């Protein structure tokens, strides 16, 4: 049984992330594991905090969530860990062989600091499974009706095609394949066209609806977000890192920009070796 791990800090943003995770779990017949991480070093805490009372309060809140979402999906449970937020959530995902991690990007109790500035991509880059990040304060429909799949000239850009197709099949989504022409060189432009054609063939094989478009792009984060706004997207799928080429603008900082600034949920996929499309 596939499982979704959700980072919980009891903020509204983490509850919003939980709602999105439950929608996916229900559609895909998956289970949900909520994870709360106690990141406080009590020996250095200037306030008198009783860790036992703190853990009791957390367990009580989880019990309320279990009651609220009872029967909403295949199964829902919770895990309490001690340590660094990002590393513990990733460890739980590995231990449970999770399908994905879902987190809100501007929560409290550790997430807010964690997601700020240059640290925005840490949980995404540390995870071995896809990470769905959902920015707080934006009202995005949870059903994945329209998914944006941006493709550039790098080989690894295609590795997000299978998980996109799988999610699309659960929701009967329409995938918008966005060919990002970042160079005027004909060989690079041809390569992107070939990658888009491969994605089209894959989606045809999997009976996934799709639309293909090409745009000339100098700033792929802004251009992708502009396109997502235009089609009223529910999800953008990106890679966490890519090869370094003269045409590649989607380096780590750009993935971080997307995660931190996208008003749309972003699924970040870590490249793997020896994948066959």
Model feature map: region roles:
Residues 37, 106, 136-138, 180, ...:
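Short, ordered loop/turn segments at secondary-structure junctions
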Residues 116-119, 191-196, 250-255:
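Charged helix-capping and loop-helix junction motifs
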Residues 50, 67-101, 205-236, 241-250, ...:
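Structural beta-alpha unit
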Residues 13, 109-110, 156, 244-246:
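Short glycine-rich, flexible loops that bind phosphorylated cofactors or substrates
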Residues 1, 97-99, 120, 129, ...:
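Local beta-strand N-terminus motif with an aromatic residue
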Residues 101-128:
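Helix-enriched interaction subdomains in cytosolic or periplasmic regions
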Residues 102-105, 130-136, 266-270:
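Short beta-strand elements of ligand-binding domains
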Residues 1-52, 146-213, 233-235, 261, ...:
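Small/aliphatic-rich secondary-structure junction motif
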